[in-house]
Amino acid sequence: RLRRAHPVNERRGHGFISSQKEGSELFAGIDPDAPIIVLLTAWQYSHHLAPSLVHHRGPILLLANFDGTWPGLVGMLCMAGCLTSLERNYSRLWSETFADEAFIRGLDTWLRDGHLSHKLGYLHPVAPSAPLLASEAGQIGVKVGQSILKHKAIVGLFDTFCMGMINGVFPQKAMIDVGMPVESLSQSALLVEMNKVPTDLREACLDWYETRGM
C-alpha cells in the first residue's frame, strides 16, 4: 500500500521539502526499513534529503518525469550524483507517461526485489591499443590530453555547494590527476566584477552574439 510520507503545506501552497531540518524531521518519523520512492518532478535541493537517505536502511527508488517542461529528470540526476558521492545505493526509474511497458516492468521489478538495474553493456573502456586512438581524431585527443596534463586546464567552480549540490564538491585528487585543478570562485564576487563592466561594452558583447545568430 502506497502512503505519502509528508503532506502538502497549505500555507506555502506546495509539498516540497524546504530545508535539511525539515527533511531530517520528516525521516525521523519514517520506518527506517520501509521502501522509499522519492518522486522528483522539478529541480530540488538534494541536500534537504540526501543525509537522511544515507541513513535509511530500506530500498530507495528515485522516480522522475521525462518532460522538458518540468525538469524532474535533471533533479533526479542531481540527487543520484549526491547519493553516489555519499556511497548510498539506490535505483532509478523515469517515464514520460508512467503507463509505458518499460516503466511498469521496472516498477514491478523494484517493488518485488528492492532494486532495479539498467543495461550498461554498451559501455566499455577504450584501451590505448584501440583503433579509435590510432585515428586522426584519436591522435588529436591524445595530444590535447597530454597538453592538459602538462599545462593544466584550471576549472573555475562557482560556489561549490550552490543549490545543495553535494555532487558539486568534486574530489580534488580525481581532478588533479587529469590535469584539471579547481579554482573556487564566488558568485558574489562575480556580481561585483560584472557591475564594473561599462554599458557600451556589455552591448557590444551582446551584439557580437546576436549578429552570429543567437
Regions found by a protein language model. Give the residues of each.
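An N-terminal assembly and electron-transfer interface module characteristic of large anaerobic redox
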Residues: 1-214
